[in-house]
């Protein structure tokens, strides 16, 4: 998701891991989403591995949501340049099991591996190992996806907005009981007097 031809996106790390992965998971398919020129990556790849990689191009928000809900795992092999990792939050929210490099932003978001599997950044062998383990263990993959999806709800804007609103409301109104329904809010009762 994003310009895959930018080195910091780490697509080369994933491509370098593919020969190892395909030895253990011969049916593996890699879908690459985002704008960029796929020929740049395909030219140096073993022809037998090329048919395992499909470049989808840039996805609309709707297509991105469908994508996240349909994959066995979302791989983020980024090598740096991320301050939060919104794409990981989107993948988690979509119910995908996440495998990501251990760059600080991803490690923090995934809480050191609690909500997604981490691999050593720029280490294609470690990436291959983590992907193979995760895809071979459907129970772990499903559990990781479920826990990640639950965790991602805290990043939903309606929930974040509601929590911010409650903080302001408590600061303004004081000790009044805070509810989730607008009609029960202390400020609303005062406003409607």
Please give the residue ranges for each predicted region.
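Nucleotide-activated donor-binding/catalytic signature segment of Leloir-type glycosyltransferases, i.e.
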Residues: 41-62, 73
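Conserved acidic donor-binding segment of nucleotide-sugar-dependent glycosyltransferases
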Residues: 112-113, 117-124, 133-139, 153
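A charged, aromatic-enriched C-terminal amphipathic alpha-helix characteristic of glycosyltransferases
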Residues: 139-176, 185
């Amino acid at each position: 998701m994003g310009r895959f031809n930018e080195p910091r996106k780490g697509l080369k790390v994933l491509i370098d891991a593919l020969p190892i992965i395909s030895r253990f998971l011969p049916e593996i398919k890699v879908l690459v989403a985002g704008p960029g020129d796929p020929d740049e990556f395909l030219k140096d790849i073993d022809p037998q591995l090329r048919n395992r990689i499909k470049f989808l191009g840039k996805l609309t928000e709707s297509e991105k949501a469908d994508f996240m809900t349909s994959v066995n795992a979302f791989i983020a092999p980024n090598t740096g340049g991320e301050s939060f990792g919104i794409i990981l939050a989107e993948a988690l929210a979509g119910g995908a099991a996440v495998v990501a490099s251990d760059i600080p932003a991803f490690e923090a978001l995934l809480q050191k591996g609690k909500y997604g599997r981490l691999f050593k950044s720029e280490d294609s062998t470690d990436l291959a190992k983590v992907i193979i383990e995760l895809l071979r263990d459907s129970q772990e993959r499903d559990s990781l996806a479920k826990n990640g999806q639950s965790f991602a709800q805290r990043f939903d804007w309606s929930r974040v907005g509601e929590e911010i609103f409650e903080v302001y409301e408590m600061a303004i109104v004081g000790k009044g009981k805070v509810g989730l329904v607008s009609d029960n809010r202390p400020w609303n009762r005062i406003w409607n007097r």
